Amino acid sequence: MGTTINLTAADGHEFAAYRAPHEGAYKGGLVLIQEIFGVTPHIKDLCNEFADLGYDVLSPAIFDRIERDAEFGYDEDQIQKSVALAGQSGIEAPILDIQACVDHLKVDGPVAITGFCYGGSLVWISAARVQGLSCAVGYYGRLIPDHLGEQPACPTMLHFGSRDASIPLTSVDKIRDARPEVDIHVFDAEHGFCSDRPQNHSTDAKAAALALTLGFFDTHMID
């Protein structure tokens, strides 16, 4: 359904992005940020799901600045490699790539951002720093409590799992206390409840979070 295109960030860096064009009535543009494993088939599936609902979706290859076409599996060795790459990528450079995606989509209408795990953390920072966003929805971003100094500049929603060992409920409460204006939802689920890993996936939590996300988009993505 989708294709890979190349975009150029403000600093001249050229990167790949998976593009899934909307089906049916157009609802706006959506930047979807990868998990720490790269723009994997699972991430492309998520892009396609949102495209089927009417969104033009772009998912930037955040790691292209360090390693082109980087994609990792779920075993411990692969996780360690992906964590190292995320650390090398930092924050400033990914924000430039995300801004380029927003600018590309913005010519056609309102743009939102969503992301999962590593991408959920980048969504939080993007909500504060990226220009032109109508709203932001982050899923189980583990690093959000470390970046509470970032002030979202657009309406922001966050989703977490109550049984997420990497994001204890005390961390979720910390976010609530620091940013009471943010719309936070907690589901009876593990970390990565939208992922394709059977031990993490929750059909019920994914569906409930999606319904809230789509309602949030409908409210805030006004041309």
Named regions from a protein language model:
Residues 1-223:
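N-terminal cap/leader regions of alpha/beta-hydrolase-fold enzymes
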